[in-house]
């Protein structure tokens, strides 16, 4: 197992208790005065879809959903990686641990997705499983296990090269009516 820690020691403090209450924080977009989006996942036989791709002129735009912030961030990571490589071609042969901390949930989500792109580039690895745990105690802490393998050009064909996660229209919402969490992301490809 690979342990990658950026500015935080991996300890018991990073593993959340089951009864943690999450609150919705003002989005980066709201703080910047940008127009908000609605957090409504399209039903798929009355089941929540994990993510959907939206039209964008030059880049890749998606929304990922979850019943919890952890599920939303796992689904966002899956949507990010699906834009790069077919996850069906990726075997879980290795795991990487990522630990991050940020004052706001959106800041943490941005770091999380950026870290996945960083790992892809520096570890020459592709990923297909993302297990995220969160804890909020003043700041937000993320401990995640990512499963995947080293790039094998015979099996992995790449769809898009993701250069970066953009801050443009990046935001997280919680739909209070159905308790659904939603993140909107634009990838610079």
Where are these regions (language model features)?
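Residue-identity detector for glycine
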Residues: 5-7, 19, 33
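Intrinsically disordered, low-complexity regions
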Residues: 46-189
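Ala/Thr-enriched low-complexity intrinsically disordered regions
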Residues: 29-32, 41-42
């Amino acid at each position: 197992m690979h342990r990658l820690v950026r500015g935080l020691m991996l300890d018991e403090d990073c593993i959340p208790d089951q009864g943690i209450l999450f609150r919705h924080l003002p989005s980066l977009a709201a703080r910047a005065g940008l127009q908000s989006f609605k957090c409504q996942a399209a039903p798929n036989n009355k089941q929540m879809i994990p993510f959907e791709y939206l039209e964008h002129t030059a880049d890749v735009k998606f929304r990922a959903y979850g019943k919890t912030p952890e599920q939303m961030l796992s689904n966002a990571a899956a949507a990010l990686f699906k834009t790069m490589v077919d996850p069906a071609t990726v075997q879980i042969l290795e795991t990487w641990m990522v630990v991050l901390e940020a004052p706001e949930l959106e800041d943490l989500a941005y770091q999380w997705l950026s870290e996945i792109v960083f790992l892809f580039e520096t570890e020459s690895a592709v990923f297909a499983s993302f297990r995220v745990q969160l804890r909020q105690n003043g700041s937000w802490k993320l401990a995640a296990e990512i499963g995947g393998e080293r790039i094998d050009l015979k099996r992995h064909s790449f769809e898009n090269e993701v250069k970066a996660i953009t801050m443009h229209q990046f935001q997280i919402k919680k739909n209070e009516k159905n308790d659904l969490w939603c993140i909107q992301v634009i990838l610079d490809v």
